[in-house]
Amino acid sequence: VIGAIPALLALVIRARMKEPERWQKMKDSGALDRHSVFTYGELFRDPRWRRNAIVGMLLVCSGVIGLWGIGFFTPELIRTVLSKTYAAQGMTKEQIGPLVDKWASWGLLTLQVGAFFGMLSASWVAARLGRRKAFAIAFSTALIATACAFQFYTNASQTFWLIPIMGFFQLAVFAVYAIYLPELFPTHLRSTGTSFCYNVGRFLAAAGVPVIGMLKTEVFAHHPEPMRPAALVMCCVFLLGLIVLPFAPETKDKPLPEDERSFAH
């Protein structure tokens, strides 16, 4: 029942949401019918939108791999570390199991609490300093915070500060995606371009999960806690975002891009 509340809220918002004025004008003029407006072919035909789509997709890959390939393994880190801690204290497996599960759940919760405040802060930074600077700060701090969390987590109390700090910086970049990606494309390609960046980026990012699995079970199998070095290596994915960033156009205080052909009729 609780899970249905966001869906009901989405229905209310959708019913009250209006189409963008520019898009509505294009629809009323019939311009939409004269273009392949909802195809990837149209998106990649123009070098401007093609470049923006590739840049946006790579930026998304960096953040999503960081989250899926590292951040969402936080419960495993907590279970591994605390299981050893409690075993050293003389607890039985029957006692340890429920206890580490509880702390793993707290880890996911505090990660999301940190994410909430991180996204709010990143939105403010993007509005004040610009999108590229917001991305640079987000990727850099995500790398540092994630590496620190997976290297220095040693006790349950850190679940309430080290993990939310990681969530704050790791998911902050997703707020910048929401602002930046729609600003890269003209009206008739905005949804197509944004969905390409998100969905293709997420599809490619799915490779991060088996990669960290391989690092744990093969490359660092000899390590007493293979999750730690595996996560440290995976943190390099945030460098991808920083490498791509010089090719990303700054959109702060600039009008939304438009393809003049769309309004030529």
Regions of interest found by a model, annotated:
Residues 78-79, 125-126, 212-221:
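Interfacial helix-cap and linker-helix signal at transmembrane-aqueous boundaries
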Residues 127-139:
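Cytoplasmic membrane-interface "Motif A"-like loop-to-helix N-cap segments
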Residues 47-116, 205-209:
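Extracytoplasmic gate region of multi-pass secondary transporters
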Residues 10-16, 180, 235-262:
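Multi-pass alpha-helical transporter architecture, strongest
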Residues 158-172:
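Hydrophobic core of transmembrane alpha-helices in multi-pass small-molecule transporters
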Residues 140-154:
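C-terminal ends and interior cores of transmembrane alpha-helices
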Residues 1-2, 216-236:
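A membrane-interface helix-boundary motif in multi-pass transporters
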Residues 15-39, 254-263:
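Flexible cytoplasmic inter-helical loops of multi-pass small-molecule transporters
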